[in-house]
Curated annotation (Swiss-Prot):
Gene coding for it: argH
Molecular functions (GO terms): argininosuccinate lyase activity
Enzyme class name: lyase
Entry protein name: Argininosuccinate lyase
HAMAP family: Arg_succ_lyase
InterPro entries per the UniProt record, alphabetical: Arg_succ_lyase_C, Argininosuccinate_lyase, Fumarase/histidase_N, Fumarate_lyase_fam, Fumarate_lyase_N, L-Aspartase-like
Subcellular location: Cytoplasm
Length: 492
């Protein structure tokens, strides 16, 4: 049975199974096993390029690494007696090519810079995947919005009927939020995109490594500028978790409204059966389970963020084993976000919105009262606060008809709106929810023309974000393909 080579120098004795399990990071290490092989290959090419390792051990090691890359890291390397996959893999390599060859791969390197590099590689891939999903979600929102620019519905504040708007205007509000999430993740990617490799434990190394060369092989924009910060920093991970948590907060809000809207007493939307479940006892039930679970996932991602911040808040420079406990929270958080966003896109794209039901609710709760007050200002010259008081008093009396408004004007401001020229026909026209929407034709407003402009502008931004994600993904995968090609040439 292979043993942990790292313990055989300074430490003696055997550990109990409970202690091995407590210290091991194997579950999280499965996320970085492939990235770790890429790091090994880049490091080995760097050692050879600088003349630090001879050709014979370098070729033997590269052949063994390529075999692992092609066929997978053996399960034994994930045994908890090794603490982590790095030690398990090193034991495998030494067993395969001998210690004289296998024991040379770790020259000029520590697990500290090795794992930090692996995490950044995988996190870059996760960011790109999340960005691609956000691009698809935003496209869905824009497409659905484009079909509902004239679908009038109630808008809410405090969950009370407030003012009429359109379904397109509502959906575009969420598209704007997810657009900002995209921007945040793009910015975070730039801070993740630096290579710690070559920083060793924290004080770099006396071996003449070319850190820019290995950074390029691994698809990084540059090497990290300070070797201590390179291994100690996890703020980049916290930043991505924060971005994912903000994104999932918007997701949760949207899911909450889909749950509410799909109820029988609201009836604004019918979710596709694929995104719902039934009851084991109540045969009529159609429960919006996907939206509910997604709503809860937002809490899970926020929990991962809180855990990551708490784990790192009191750590001294530079590397501390506490950071091992952060990594599972990082993977769980980004995975929950990455899984949720495509499902939300599918749920929205397959949903059926009831335009008639929305229109019927659009004028309830005196939702056009604001427009009536505005008309008293724009067309009859009243101060807004006076108009606000008159309309509010009429609402208190239970009606916005001419007689009630006249009584409210005399009661609240001691004058006559009838004498100003207000008519029953004017009131009826103003209180039409479609009128209230149509006159709000300014930048960002719900009028069809304003909404069309928003859709056009956001489609242009979406196209740029989509191109960036595709180009970045292509560049990263291209770097990995080039690395594997160089590794195969080297081993041949």
């Amino acid at each position: 049975m292979r043993s942990d080579q790292i313990r055989q120098g300074r430490l003696a004795g055997e550990r109990s199974g409970d202690l091995e399990h407590f210290l091991a990071s194997m579950d999280a290490d499965r996320w970085i096993a492939r990235a770790d092989l890429l790091v090994d290959m880049a490091h080995l090419l760097g050692l050879s390029r600088q003349g630090i390792i001879d050709e014979a051990p370098a070729r033997a090691l590269m052949a063994a690494l390529l075999d692992l890359y092609d066929h997978g890291v053996p399960e034994e390397a994930f045994d908890e007696r090794f603490e982590d996959v790095h030690a398990g893999k090193e034991a495998y390599l030494i067993d395969r090519v001998g210690e004289d060859f296998g024991g040379r791969l770790h020259m000029g390197r520590s697990r500290n810079d090795e794992v930090a590099t692996c995490i950044r590689i995988r996190l870059k891939e996760e960011i790109i995947a999340l960005l691609r999903s956000l691009v698809d979600l935003r496209a869905t929102l824009l497409d659905v919005a484009a079909g509902h620019t004239g679908t009038v519905m109630p808008g809410f504040t405090h969950l009370q009927h407030a003012q009429p708007t359109t379904l397109a205007h509502y959906l575009l509000a969420y598209e704007q939020a997810f657009s900002r999430d995209t921007a945040r993740l793009r910015e975070a990617y730039a801070r993740v995109d630096v290579s710690p490799l070559g920083s060793a434990a924290f004080a770099s190394t006396g071996f003449p490594l070319d850190r820019a060369y290995t950074a390029s092989l691994l698809g990084f924009s540059r090497p990290a500028g300070n070797s201590m910060d390179a291994v100690a920093a996890r703020d980049f991970a916290i930043e991505v978790l924060a971005d994912a948590s903000i994104c999932m907060t918007s997701t949760s809000r949207l899911c909450e409204e889909l749950v509410l809207w799909s109820t029988a007493f609201v009836g604004f939307v019918r979710l596709d059966d694929a995104y719902c479940s039934s009851s084991s006892i109540m045969p009529q039930k159609k429960n919006p389970d996907v939206a509910e679970i997604m709503r809860a996932k937002a809490g899970s991602v926020a929990g991962s963020l809180a855990a990551a911040i708490t784990i790192t808040k009191g750590l001294p420079m530079s590397y501390n084993r506490d950071l091992q406990e952060l990594t599972p929270h990082l993977w769980r958080g980004v995975e929950a976000a990455r899984q949720s966003i495509p499902l939300l896109s599918g749920m929205l794209g397959s949903a059926t919105f009831d335009a008639e039901r929305m229109a019927a609710e659009a004028g309830r709760g005196f939702s056009t009262a604001t427009e009536l007050a505005d008309v008293l200002v724009r067309e009859y010259g009243l101060p807004f606060r006076t108009a606000h008081r008159i309309v509010g008093r009429a609402v208190r009396h239970g009606s916005l008809d001419l007689a009630t408004l006249e009584a409210a004007a005399r009661e609240a401001a001691d004058f006559s709106v009838v004498e100003l020229g207000l008519t029953r026909e004017k009131i009826d026209a103003v209180l039409d929810p479609r009128h209230a929407v149509a006159v709000r034709n300014i930048v960002g407003g719900p009028a069809p023309e304003a909404v069309a402009a928003q859709i056009s502008e956001q489609r242009n931004l979406l196209a740029r974000d989509k191109a960036w994600a595709e180009e970045t993904e292509s560049a990263l995968s291209g770097a990995f393909e080039h690395l594997i090609l160089e590794a195969r040439r080297f081993a041949a």
